[in-house]
Amino acid sequence: MASTRLFVLLVIGTVLLCQVSGFLDELLAEHELPQDMTKRGCRNAYSSAICGKVITADDCMRKSSSRMGSFARKKCQRLCGIC
């Protein structure tokens, strides 16, 4: 009886592990930059400590009158995809 429970738990664990590893591959593929964004003119004026951590992609969508929105569009063009 105990060996049957252990076998069922191992099978369920294996199935879940396969699903998670497939899901991680999809997530990594989504976060790759498109080829047109890797050209020379498309870059962030500040390091990734600012463009990516302090300034996020949501800040690119803010109103142009907001400080974060205007800074993001001017200085973090690669992050916002404005190239």
From Swiss-Prot:
One of its GO terms (molecular function) is toxin activity. It is found in: Secreted; Nematocyst. Keywords: Cleavage on pair of basic residues, Nematocyst, Secreted, Signal, Toxin. Its main location: secreted. Residues 20-38 form a propeptide. GO terms for cellular component: extracellular region; nematocyst. Residues 1-19 form the signal peptide. The keyword Signal applies. Belongs to the sea anemone 8 toxin family. This is U-actitoxin-Avd8d. It comes from Anemonia viridis.
